[in-house]
Amino acid sequence: MKYAAKKIGLTLLTMVIVSFLAFLAFQVIPGDPAVKLLGTEATPERIAALRAEMGLDRPFLERYVQWVLGALKGDFGTSYSYKMPVSSMLAGKLPVTGLLTGMSFVLILAFSIPLGIFTARHAGGRLDRAMTAVNQVLMAIPAFVTGILLTYVFGLVLRWFVPGNYVSPGDNLGGSLWYFLFPAVSIALPRVAMTVKMLRSSILSELQKDYVRTSHSRGNSDRATLYRHVLRNAMGPVVSFLAMTAADIVAGSVVIEQVFSLPGLGRMLLTSIANRDYPVVQAVVVIVAFWVVLVNLLAYLINQRLDPRLRLQ
């Protein structure tokens, strides 16, 4: 219990450090947002006035503390480019990236767990060798290449969906889920292959341990031993890997959103970086960092349930 509390404390400390570094990074990189907005021909007086309006003339720590206090209340400031609250912009983009991330992760779980168990139970067989070969191919193909291929085959050739014709869940939930399926598959395929490989290796490693032979000596079948004992122990490293995968999906969605013209956080982030719209970029970076830290904390708590030894620490 003490270790769990320490873990949560470290999580909060990590968020503070990440927020500070994110805020600091955009203060030291070359370029002035005021000059970017007004142009290089603007007079020094106009630039100074805009910097004061944007709060860039105040001390760094004062601006950071004010930004953190605002962020805790859901106020990430005002966009330099669009002159609107960043929180309002996020409200329109987060559901898109959230739905894409959720669908991708569901696909990963739905296919990788059964396939990992299947290949481990039939290790060395023809199907296992075939799956290993397919996994190697899937892991070698970048998600954006898969996305382009899916767009060409299912969008342009078979016309199962209209490329670039984003459908909002609020307007048509069924049509939206169908459109999101293709970018979700693009993200999920290489990660399914990696998770299958990880789970297969973990199960095969557990099958070599003494408790498996003890279970067999008590009359338990291979199937019963696998599902009652082996799988629980084998899932520890897989859960940690899935946590990293859940975090990686958000990063991978940046390119996929471009390929499928999805109005999510990824596209907004790229546009904001190009425009030096620091409040938007800072907010996205902190939100992504929070997601990464959160899924790793959840992975630890799940592993604590799977492994009683962690609960005793």
Residue ranges and their predicted role:
Residues 52-61, 73-86, 167-180, 187, ...:
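Membrane-interfacial helix-loop-helix junctions in multi-pass membrane proteins
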Residues 18, 22-26, 147, 151, ...:
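Juxtamembrane/transmembrane-helix interface segments of polytopic membrane transporters
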Residues 2-3, 12, 90, 94-128, ...:
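Alpha-helical transmembrane segments of integral membrane proteins
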Residues 22-28, 58, 66-69, 134-164, ...:
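Membrane-water interface segments at the C-terminal ends of transmembrane alpha-helices
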Residues 57-113:
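An internal, D/E-rich "acidic patch" concept
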Residues 15-65, 158-179:
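Hydrophobic alpha-helical transmembrane segments of membrane transport/permease proteins
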Residues 11, 19, 41, 136, ...:
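Residue-level recognition of pore/gate-forming positions within transmembrane alpha-helices
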